[in-house]
Amino acid sequence: QRQMCIRDSPCMAKKKEAREEDIADAIDYVLTFQEVQDIFDAAGIQPELLSEDEKEHSSRAGRIYARTGGVSEAVKKTVEQIDPDKKIPVIPEQADGVPACKKLIERIQKGETEANFFEGMACNGGCVGGPKIIIKKEEGKERVDAYGDEAQYKTPLENPFVLELLERLGYDSVENFLENSEILTRNFGE
């Protein structure tokens, strides 16, 4: 039986992104939150009545990506864990919404920032403010933060399931994986 990968998101851009050549075979379908809600409504599915899956393996770092500042926090905490004595600390700066992203790019080009890691969220509030959200972005941010706070692990480096997966793939450490894997590299062509 063939497995499928269905991505759900409040983001319309994910539909196009899933068709990009270098990842086209990774995702079968992309549904917006609104489309998932419509399917649930038509099928009479009430997620709030379903039992929760107690097998949560995600870290706080992975859970908070959906809101502005989440990517920055995740990267900063993970880098600090990989190399606590790093001579150059991660100094993040975020831009929230397309106009703010454009201004941030201008500031970077003019050398008007001390940051060395930049997070630009096209949607105000991050993904929680995407065009196909089904709750208000403020509530989405609160839920994302609460979900992050419930995580058993702060970063993937603490997660035994991630470490076991890396070992199965032939990597003896996260550092070895980062040095020798191209899994985090995207090819956007020329």
What is each residue range found by the language model?
Residues 1, 14:
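Mid-sequence acidic-hydrophobic segments that form the walls
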Residues 2-6:
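Short, small-residue-biased leader/transition segments that mark boundaries at the very start
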Residues 7, 15-17:
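Proline/glycine-rich low-complexity loops and linkers
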Residues 11:
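Phosphate/adenylate-binding glycine loop and adjacent helical scaffold
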Residues 19, 24-190:
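Iron-sulfur (Fe-S) cluster-binding modules
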